[in-house]
């Protein structure tokens, strides 16, 4: 009886995996690509969300991270200016585990475009931001290495953004 139950579990696992792979493949189909993308984006304002209190304990500083990201994006072809409707925003959510003397950071880099729209529920024009592109990555390390580990993650996210931007603008450049 245990043998049948084990095989049944394996069969369910294989079916679940096939369904997952099918959904993942479908989600990557160019026909399902979102309408919002980076096509035509050239000018950006690079912004940063506030660091958590634990970030200081973990050695993170916006004074180090800000120029790292901004320079990476500019080297990749973006033009950074102080005023534009397109934002590239980096958020770093950091926690410190005192018991293990370790830090964890969840980094999110996104590109957002300010748009105006008519809100029928209130009857007037509003403004807000739409997501053009967004990715995230996590890193865990000891306190002594966390700033360097986080810098690597920020650079990887910037590289991914630059690659996506170039792909979206292949035909327009």
Language-model features and meaning:
Residues 28-36, 121-173:
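C-terminal/domain-edge helix-coil "capping" segments
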Residues 76, 84-144:
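Surface-exposed short loop/turn segments
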Residues 23-67, 163-173:
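A structural "domain/chain start" motif
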Residues 2-13:
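Bacterial N-terminal signal peptides that target proteins for export
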Residues 11-22:
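Bacterial N-terminal signal peptides
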Residues 58-88:
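N-terminal, post-signal-peptide region of Sec/Tat-exported proteins
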């Amino acid at each position: 009886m245990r043998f049948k139950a084990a095989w049944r579990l394996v069969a369910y696992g294989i079916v679940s995996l096939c369904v997952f792979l099918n959904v993942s493949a479908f989600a990557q189909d160019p026909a399902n690509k979102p309408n919002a993308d980076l096509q035509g984006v050239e000018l950006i304002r690079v912004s940063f969300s506030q660091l958590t209190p634990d970030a200081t304990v973990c050695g993170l500083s916006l004074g180090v991270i800000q120029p790292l990201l901004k320079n990476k994006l500019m080297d990749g072809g973006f033009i950074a200016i102080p005023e534009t409707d397109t934002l590239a925003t980096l958020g770093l959510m950091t926690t410190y585990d005192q018991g293990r003397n370790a830090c964890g950071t969840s980094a999110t880099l996104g590109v957002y475009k300010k748009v105006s729209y008519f809100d029928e529920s209130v009857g007037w024009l509003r403004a807000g931001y739409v997501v053009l592109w967004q990715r995230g990555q996590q890193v865990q390390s000891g306190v002594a290495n966390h700033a360097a580990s986080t810098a690597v993650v920020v650079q990887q996210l910037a590289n991914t953004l630059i690659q996506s931007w170039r792909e979206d603008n292949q035909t327009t450049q």
